[in-house]
Amino acid sequence: MGNQKNGIYDARTLGMPRMIVLGLQHMFAMFGATVLVPALTGLSVSATLLFAGLGTLMFHVLTKGKVPAFLGSSFAFIGGYAAIAPNGEKELLPYACIGVAAAGFLYVVLSLLIKLFGQKKVMRFFPPIVTGPIIIAIGLTLSKSAIDNCDTNWAVALVAIFVVILANIFGKGMVKIIPIILGVVASFTLAAIIGDVDFTPVLEAPWIGLPFSMEDTVFPVLRHGDGALIFTAVITIMPIALATMVEHIGDISAISSTTGRDFFEDPGLHRTLMGDGVATILASLFGAPANTTYGENTGVLSLTKVYDPAVIRIAALFAALVSFSPKFAALISTMPAATVGGVSIVLYGMISSVGVRNLVENQVDLSKGRNLIIAALILGLSIGINYSGSLTFIVGSVTITLSGLAVGAMSGILLNALLPLEEKDYKGLNKDYMKDDEEDIVEEKKA
């Protein structure tokens, strides 16, 4: 992961106008999934955009501006929202947000523990045979939503796909690095011509508006709310953070593999995890969904090969600004689902391709039964459970819901830790993080 890739690491060489266009491209890439979470949970779309932008900027501050990651709405907590506030009941949503804020706090605690005890003790559980299939699974599980969106109008979706491919493969100069914007514009135009776009919400929306109201935040509930319900929300939702932490490591692995820079070493896992946690706490306090590093934007990095985090920060500023203009937010919301699905198919496929490359570059030997079983279980559980929904179980009076990716990733980590591993099996694994284990094997043989 530490090998420099051929790409643009300093976008200032392109000039500010082009950086702005690239920032807009990242905003378009994340928009569809980011606004879907509040649509499913009943939270505010404008607040979601504001705190996606502010959360991303906070993440960049905490990671020293080194990680080109955008933070958008996390789907992992949808089950938690539904458990506390079924059908998006407005008066119960602040309680769910308190539970999500507690999960963000757990992220912060875990990041401090990693800093205290050293991240090598954590990363030894995440060699390429684990992270590679997890990254592949991230892309493949996301692709289900892309196909669902494409099903609304395959003609519109195919235009987006073809334009993205043509721009990326045959484009020159600026055209080559803005395939997503070109695909969105072409597909959106076709959809508008055939009457697939309803501009009524745009015409009715005001130009300026506040993204959230105080009654939607958690503060009134913290002062005068039901203490028992707050406790229930915390113990129901907080454990989800343990599963999403594994997904976070997969996301950072994907970004590291894409850019050729080891972000586990610099700025460190404790900083990226802290960034996710603080962003989630901030968003939840003001009635927005939990934040997480977004795979869509990793796909954009892989497609355009522009790796400068400054471009992501421009996208974050745009997201925050758009949240204060209901009219612009409505305009972007009119983007047809098929357009979002078309570009997403390419982006999610790029994520899975990064996972395959991770396995190849680290020379993981899949002819060995141990490696094959680990990869098979991660992929089988992640994708299989994702298509059936999620895994739900009850502990006492608490209902816990885990995504397929969380179950698959945790199963792979457990198998990797438990299955016997001989010295020769370390070939191609992450040498820095596995060095301690290699020394343990040598010591055991001496004994």
Residue locations for each model-derived region?
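Intrinsically disordered, low-complexity non-transmembrane regions of multi-pass membrane transporters
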Residues: 1-21, 199-220, 257-262, 418-447
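Juxtamembrane interface elements at the cytosolic ends of transmembrane helices
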Residues: 2, 31-34, 162-167, 178, ...
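Membrane-embedded helical hairpins/re-entrant loop segments and their flanking transmembrane helices
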Residues: 6-17, 39-60, 66, 236-309, ...
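Hydrophobic, membrane-embedded alpha-helices of multi-pass small-molecule transporters
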Residues: 17-30, 156-160, 178-179, 211-251, ...
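Transmembrane helix-boundary motif of multi-pass solute transporters/channels
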Residues: 22-55, 60, 67-92
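Short, non-helical or kinked segments that cap or interrupt transmembrane helices
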Residues: 43-48, 65-77, 122-131, 176-181, ...
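Interfacial segments of multi-pass membrane proteins
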Residues: 81-88, 168, 297-312, 318-323
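Membrane-embedded alpha-helical modules
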Residues: 91-201, 316-429
